[in-house]
Structures are given as C-alpha cells and as structure tokens.
Amino acid sequence: MGGKLSKKKKGYNVNDEKAKEKDKKAEGAATEEEGTPKESEPQAAAEPAEAKEGKEKPDQDAEGKAEEKEGEKDAAAAKEEAPKAEPEKTEGAAEAKAEPPKAPEQEQAAPGPAAGGEAPKAAEAAAAPAESAAPAAGEEPSKEEGEPKKTEAPAAPAAQETKSDGAPASDSKPGSSEAAPSSKETPAATEAPSSTPKAQGPAASAEEPKPVEAPAANSDQTVTVKE
C-alpha cells in the first residue's frame, strides 16, 4: 500500500485525497474483516466445547445404558436362577410328599403280617370247637367259618377271646380242618389292613368285636350241649 501511495504522490497529486480515502476505506474494510473472524473465533471455540460436551454426554449416556443393560442382565440371570431353584425346591417337596405315603404303606403292610399271624391262631382256635361239633352237626363249622370272614378286621380280639374259649377242645384230628379255615381267612385278613385306612381299622376293630363275641359264645354253648 505504501508503494502505491508513493507512486500516486509522485505522478498524480490531484487524486491523492481520493486515493487516501480509498485506502482508508480499504483499510477499514480489512480491519472489519479481521475483526469479524476474531469475533467468530470465540464462537467457533465455544461450538467445539459444546460439541465436546455433547459427545461426552452420549458417552455418558452410553455408559449409563451399558450399566443398565448389565443390571438388567444380572436381574434376568437372577430371575432365571430363581425359577431354577424353585423347581428344585418343588422337586424336593414332591419327593418329601411322595415319601410320607410310603410310610403309611409300610405301616399298613406291618399290621398285615401281624394280622395274618394272628388270623391262623384265630382260625385254629375257632376250628377247635368246630371240630368238636363236627361229628354232631356239619353245618356249624360252615357258619363259624363264614362269620370270621365277615369280621376280618377284629381278628386280634377274636383271637384273644377264642383262645380262652377254644383251649379246652379235645380232638385228635386238627390237621385238615385247621388248614382249610386258616388258608381261607389269612388272605382276607392280609387284604384288610392294606385296603382299609388307619382310621377305619381301629374303628372297625372297636365296633365289630361285639358281634364276634356272640357267635363265639354261642358256638361254645352248642359244643358243651352236644358234648
């Protein structure tokens, strides 16, 4: 700019003022242009800062989302493990529930042999008076055999009563007649505890001995009369 002004001063003195004004305008425009970039630079600097903050925010959001996803995965895994543990508990409970019925079955099976063991005794005791009455009347043994079949549950009290009543019986042939009632009565006696529940067994044994006692006494009376 200085060279141009010097040339103008040398060659064109008339236009010096106009040239100076033009130079001033050009310098002012240049300063304005230089000023605007300076003003825009802070804005540009502010914009990258905002952009950086914006980028950091998505990163933080992404981290937060990742943590949330991990938390959800952990929760889902915990939920999945919980149902797995629950079926195990239910299986254990089912096994525990399945085992108690076995115990009653064993208990029911236990009185079976006991009743079966007592049933032959009752059959032998009942067969003794039946044999003594057999020469006199052949109908009484069949009646007596039919009655113990009806009263299978109270075999034990009947055995106790018939032992005391049938002990003095005197016969030399107890083999065949004893085997028949014992073979007929024992399966029925063994079936009774397995088919009847615990509650019904004692109730039946408590209620039914009365009708059993009567035929036992009647049979003893008939035996004594016929003897």
From Swiss-Prot:
Residue numbers bearing the Phosphoserine modification: S40, S164, S170, S172, S176, S195, S205, S219
Entry similarity comment: Belongs to the BASP1 family.
Keywords: Cell membrane, Cell projection, Isopeptide bond, Lipoprotein, Membrane, Myristate, Phosphoprotein, Ubl conjugation
GO biological process terms on file: diaphragm development; gonad development; mesenchymal to epithelial transition; metanephric mesenchyme development; negative regulation of DNA-templated transcription; podocyte differentiation; positive regulation of heart growth; positive regulation of metanephric ureteric bud development
GO molecular-function terms, A-Z: calmodulin binding; protein domain specific binding; transcription cis-regulatory region binding; transcription corepressor activity
Gene expressing this chain: BASP1
Chain intervals for the UniProt region annotation (Disordered): 1-227
Cross-link (Glycyl lysine isopeptide (Lys-Gly) (interchain with G-Cter in SUMO2)): K25, K84, K97, K163
Modified residues (Phosphothreonine): T31, T36, T196
Biased segments, Basic and acidic residues type: 15-27, 49-105, 140-152
Protein name: Brain acid soluble protein 1
PANTHER family recorded: BRAIN ACID SOLUBLE PROTEIN 1 (PTHR23212:SF0)
Tissue expression per record: Brain.
Main location: membrane
Superkingdom of source: Eukaryota
Membrane topology, from the record: Lipid-anchor
Compositional bias segments (type: Basic residues): 1-11
GO cellular component: cell junction; chromatin; cytoplasm; cytoskeleton; extracellular exosome; growth cone; nuclear matrix; nuclear speck
Species this chain originates from: Homo sapiens (Human)
Localization: Cell membrane; Cell projection, Growth cone
Keyword Hydrolase belongs to the record: no
Keyword Ubl conjugation included in the entry's annotation: yes
Low complexity: compositionally biased ranges: 106-139
